[in-house]
Design a protein with these regions (language model features):
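Bacterial N-terminal signal peptides that target proteins for export
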Residues: 1-11
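Long, well-structured alpha-helical subdomains associated
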Residues: 105-156
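Catalytic zinc-binding patch centered on the HExxH motif and its immediate surroundings
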Residues: 25-49, 54-58
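Bacterial N-terminal signal peptides
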Residues: 10-19
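Post-HEXXH active-site segment of zinc metalloproteases
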Residues: 58, 74-104
């Protein structure tokens, strides 16, 4: 004899609907401590902070070059707050991060990092930061096109 199906309890139904009805989230929102270096506005000026646990001098040099690009971008934008407010889309984040990671990549390669692997890693980071992981190959292609080893070299 088969057991008679029992009606789903109200609590079980609410739990099921609560789990099913919530939007899926691939990852949590980023926090400042997630970044090894971060440039933000303080008293209207771009200020960079590197995490205190970053002690490797080679990595610190890379991060300082990367964040210097963001400070220059902010200065060219008119105001730090306006620059930060402009970072509202994946496309805009990619546009801002490409030159910063390009500068960091040049330093890393000069320090002996593998050119291709580092460029690929940086493309993935840009894609993740912008929330556009589906564009990671396109971002890698842009880094290859727009970021020669030496800044005075024309793009291929």
């Amino acid at each position: 004899m088969r057991p008679t199906p029992r009606p789903m309890g109200a609590a079980a139904l609410l739990l099921l609907l609560g789990l099913w009805g919530r939007p899926a989230s691939a990852q949590r929102a980023a926090f400042p401590d997630d970044f090894l270096g971060l440039t933000r506005c303080e008293a209207g000026r771009p200020v960079t902070r590197l995490r205190p646990d970053v002690r490797d001098s080679l990595l610190r040099e890379q991060l300082e070059v990367h964040e210097a690009v963001h400070r220059r971008q902010s200065d060219q934008f008119g105001s730090c707050e306006a620059f930060m407010a402009s970072l509202g889309s994946a496309r805009r984040i990619i546009e801002v991060e490409l030159p910063a990671y390009c500068a960091q990549w040049r330093v890393a390669v000069r320090q002996g990092a593998d050119s291709s692997a580092t460029r690929r890693d940086f493309a993935w980071r840009i894609a993740a930061q912008s929330g556009a992981m589906e564009n990671r190959l396109e971002i890698l292609q842009r880094l290859e096109r727009e970021c020669p080893v030496r800044p005075d070299q024309p793009p291929p």
